[in-house]
Amino acid sequence: MKIVADENMPFVEALFGGLGDVVRVNGRSLSAKDLKDADVLLVRSVTKVNQTLLQDCQSLKFVGSATIGTDHIDQAYLKHRGIPFANAPGCNATGVGEYAFIAALELAQREQVNLKDKVIGIVGAGNTGMAAAKCFAAFGNKVLVCDPFKTQDMLYFPLVGLDELIQQADIISLHVPLSDNGPYKTWYLFDEARLESLTPNTWLFNCCRGEVIDNRALIEFKRRRDDIKLVLDVWQGEPHPMAELVPLTEFATPHIAGYSLEGKARGTFMLYQALATSLNLPVKASLQSLLPSHFVNQLGLASQTELTQGQLLSLARLVYDLRDDDKNFRQAFDKTNGFDQLRKNHTHRREFSALTLASSGGCEVNWLTKLGFSGVGR
C-alpha cells in the first residue's frame, strides 16, 4: 500500500509504516503526478483536495486531513468517487485554546494589567473556542460566547450576539470556520465597519482563519487606533501576509496556534484510527507512546499562597514561550518560503498537560489542573 503524506505531518512513519510504504511530499505544491498509484493520502490545510488533484488517481482508498476544518477538501467529489474521508476534529483544540490564554497572559504582563479583570469574548463555540473559554474560566475570567449555531442550553457560558459581545468584552478571540456564503458567512466578519465598532483598548486575537478579518482594513484601522492590541496567528493571503500589518501586532505567529506536539500527534493518530477502521485493521499503536517526556518531569509548588499572574506566566513559559515564535516570525516571514519554513520547523511546543505539578505548600493545584496542567496533589 502506497501512503502519500504531507512532509510536515509528524509520527506518520511510526503509525502508518507498518501498513505500507510512506512517501513524503510538500503539501502546498502537491500535484496529481505525485499521487500516481497512491492508496492513501494524508494532508493538512495547505493542500486543496479536489477533482483536479485526484482525477488521475484511480487506486485511492482513503483521504485523511489532520485538521479540524475541511474547507480545503471537496467532500462531495470524494463521496462521488466512493473514497472514505476522515479529518481530526478537536485534535489541536487544546493547543489553540492555550495559545489564546498564553497570549493574554503575556500581553497582560507587558501592559501591567490584571488579566482576571478582563471580560473575555469568544467568537465561535466549536472545539477551539471552547478550549480557550475553558482556560480563561479556570483562571477566573468572565467569559461570553457568540455562535449563531448554538443555543444557550448547549453552553455553560452566556450566549450573546456579536454586537453585544463587542460592546462588553475586553478581549475578543476569534475561533470560527471560514465561510464565504450563507446567512452567517465569516469571510470578512470583521470588516471596516465592525472594526470601527470595537470599544477603546480592546484586545483582538485571531486564531482561526486570516480572511475572517479584512487585513487591509485592519491596517488602516490600527494606524488610527493604537489603543487596540492585536494578536494574529493567521493572515489573509497566507503564506504571504501583508508586510505592513506585522509591525502593528503585539504578537505575530505563522498559523501555529494549534501546533503543539500533543495536537500534532493527536491529529495523525485520529487518521490512523480512521484508516484502520476503514480497512478493518487492528489498532496496534497508542497516542501516549508517541510523546516524549517533558524536560521538567515534575515541578513542586512551594508557595504558601495562590500563584501570582507573573508566576503563572513563568510556569506557562516552561511549556510554551510565545515570545520565541513572535521573534522568529518577525525575522523571517518576508523571506522566500519563510512562512512555511517556520511552520515546518516548529516542533518544540508542548501543552500544559506535559507538565506535572505537585504542591508542598498552600498553593492549590486544582485550578491549575482545570487550566490543563497535570497534577498529583500534595
From Swiss-Prot:
InterPro entries from the UniProt entry: D-iso_2-hydroxyacid_DH_PdxB, D-isomer_2_OHA_DH_cat_dom, D-isomer_DH_NAD-bd, Erythronate-4-P_DHase, Erythronate-4-P_DHase_dimer, NAD(P)-bd_dom_sf, PdxB_dimer_sf
Enzyme Commission number(s) from the entry: 1.1.1.290
Biological processes annotated in GO: pyridoxine biosynthetic process
SUPFAM superfamilies noted in UniProt: Formate/glycerate dehydrogenase catalytic domain-like (SSF52283), NAD(P)-binding Rossmann-fold domains (SSF51735)
UniProt KW keywords: Cytoplasm, NAD, Oxidoreductase, Pyridoxine biosynthesis
Name of the featured protein: Erythronate-4-phosphate dehydrogenase
Binding-site positions, substrate: 45, 67, 259
Gene3D superfamilies: 3.30.1370.170, NAD(P)-binding Rossmann-like Domain
Active-site residue numbers: 209, 238, 255
Cited Pfam families: 2-Hacid_dh (PF00389), 2-Hacid_dh_C (PF02826), DUF3410 (PF11890)
Any one GO cellular component localisation term in the record: cytoplasm
Pathway the protein takes part in: Cofactor biosynthesis; pyridoxine 5'-phosphate biosynthesis; pyridoxine 5'-phosphate from D-erythrose 4-phosphate: step 2/5
GO molecular function, one term: 4-phosphoerythronate dehydrogenase activity
Functional description taken from the UniProt entry: Catalyzes the oxidation of erythronate-4-phosphate to 3-hydroxy-2-oxo-4-phosphonooxybutanoate.
Subcellular location: Cytoplasm
Catalytic activity: 4-phospho-D-erythronate + NAD(+) = (R)-3-hydroxy-2-oxo-4-phosphooxybutanoate + NADH + H(+)
Binding site for NAD(+): 147, 233, 258
Entry's family note: Belongs to the D-isomer specific 2-hydroxyacid dehydrogenase family. PdxB subfamily.
Binding partners and assembly: Homodimer.
